[in-house]
């Protein structure tokens, strides 16, 4: 019995994880945002930063793929969640209607 309690005391408690700020850094310096043609610099991915989010949305309103944006898998997941959160908040439209198309 005494041996079990000694083992429990030596086990470290779980540390709370700090929330990491997602940063958009081009992988290997080759990421190019397809809409602008400019290399992507260092940005903090946030749903309130609509100027950045719009660059990763197609003219039809779809989220661009990793191949088109050059993001890593982790950055793409964070970007998709930020775009979805901005859509629900009304900051970014769900669908972009082009001038010649009908509803």
Swiss-Prot record:
Keyword entries, A-Z: Chloroplast, Plastid, Ribonucleoprotein, Ribosomal protein, RNA-binding, rRNA-binding
Pfam families: Ribosomal_S18
Family in the record: Belongs to the bacterial ribosomal protein bS18 family.
Cellular component terms per the entry's GO annotation: chloroplast; mitochondrial small ribosomal subunit
Cellular compartment(s): Plastid, Chloroplast
A GO biological-process term: translation
Lineage top rank: taxon: Eukaryota
The keyword Isomerase appears for this protein: no
GO function terms (MF aspect): small ribosomal subunit rRNA binding; structural constituent of ribosome
Family matches, as InterPro entries: Ribosomal_bS18, Ribosomal_bS18_CS, Ribosomal_bS18_sf
Assembly mode: Part of the 30S ribosomal subunit.
The protein's name: Small ribosomal subunit protein bS18c
Classification via PANTHER family: 30S RIBOSOMAL PROTEIN S18, SMALL RIBOSOMAL SUBUNIT PROTEIN BS18M
Keyword Transmembrane: no
Gene that this polypeptide is encoded by: rps18
């Amino acid at each position: 019995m005494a041996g079990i309690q000694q083992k429990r005391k030596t086990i470290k408690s779980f540390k709370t994880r700090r929330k990491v700020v997602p940063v958009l850094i081009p992988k290997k310096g080759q990421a190019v945002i397809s809409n602008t043609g400019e290399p992507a610099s260092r940005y903090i991915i946030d749903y309130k930063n609509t100027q950045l989010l719009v660059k990763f949305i197609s003219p039809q309103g779809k989220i661009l793929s990793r191949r088109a944006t050059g993001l890593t898998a982790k950055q793409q997941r964070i970007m998709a969640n930020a775009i979805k959160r901005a859509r629900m908040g009304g900051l970014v439209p769900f669908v972009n209607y082009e001038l010649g198309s009908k509803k």
